[in-house]
Swiss-Prot record:
This is Outer membrane protein P.III. The lineage of its organism: Bacteria, Pseudomonadati, Pseudomonadota, Betaproteobacteria, Neisseriales. It comes from the Bacteria. The keyword Plastid does not apply. Residues 69-76 are annotated as: 4 X 2 AA tandem repeats of X-P. It is a multi-pass membrane protein. Disulfide bonds join 185-208. Belongs to the outer membrane OOP (TC 1.B.6) superfamily. Keywords: Cell outer membrane, Disulfide bond, Ion transport, Membrane, Porin, Repeat, Signal, Transmembrane, Transmembrane beta strand, Transport. GO terms for biological process: monoatomic ion transport. Residues 1-22 form the signal peptide. Sequence repeats lie at residues 69-70, 71-72, 73-74, 75-76. One of its GO terms (molecular function) is porin activity.
């Protein structure tokens, strides 16, 4: 009687153990170790499958029953070019360094300076160049207008001869219309008083209004920037 009870108890224990393994295996399709919760393998390293195994739904890559699905490659990052932006710059060239007083022929030393400027203006990002001639207020308005035009064209032609494309350069004379030193300099000369000779006052006035005798080179350049859009990072 005692031996029979022991055998019955052992049978119940084995049955319970088998039920537990079967219950776990029915979910995973493989025989799983109750201690490590890992799939049991045979001596050949093969995974043990049970009667509940369904390869289509339960097959695992590590057991050779499924093929790993490669992760999709990240989409290429689109580089967006912004609309061109324009940068304007004015370079003022003193007529004193370019021409003699009341002259429209370039000084020898001015040639080298204009050659350096031409190299810069020949760059592909330079869209347009406007050469403006200016004079002081001395002399008639008509005379000053003509002088400013001649000087502007002399500078523009020199730049073209040094490699600046003629299609991007223009020249205009503005005469004395933008003279800025007139009133300031007249006030300064007046301070010399009655004792100063007329010639001295004229000399002082010519020197004072020198900044008005100039050639402005107005440059418009194109700046195009490439922008990489920021990726959206989703938080889980």
């Amino acid at each position: 009687m005692t031996k029979q009870l022991k055998l019955s108890a052992l049978f119940v224990a084995l049955l319970a153990s088998g039920t537990a393994v079967a219950g776990e295996a029915s979910v995973q399709g493989y025989t799983v170790s109750g201690q490590s919760n890992e799939i049991v393998r045979n001596n050949y390293g093969e995974c043990w499958k049970n009667a509940y195994f369904d390869k289509a739904s339960q097959g695992r890559v590590e057991c050779g029953d499924a093929v790993a699905v490669p992760e999709p490659e990240p989409a290429p990052v689109a580089v967006v070019e912004q609309a061109p932006q324009y940068v304007d710059e004015t370079i003022s060239l003193s007529a004193k360094t370019l021409f003699g007083f009341d002259k429209d022929s370039l000084r020898a030393e001015a040639q080298d300076n204009l050659k350096v400027l031409a190299q810069r203006l020949s760059r592909t990002n330079v869209q347009s160049v406007r050469v403006e001639g200016h004079t002081d207020f001395m002399g008639s308005e008509k005379y000053n207008q003509a002088l400013s035009e001649r000087r502007a064209y002399v500078v523009a032609n020199n730049l073209v001869s040094n490699g600046v494309p003629a299609s991007r350069i223009s020249a205009v004379g503005l005469g004395e219309s933008q003279a800025q030193m007139t009133q300031v300099c007249q006030a300064e000369v007046a301070k010399l008083g009655a004792k100063a000779s007329k010639a001295k006052k004229r000399e002082a006035l010519i020197a004072c209004i020198e900044p008005d005798r100039r050639v402005d080179v107005k440059i418009r350049s194109i700046v195009t920037r490439q922008v990489v859009p920021a990726r959206n990072h989703h938080q889980h």
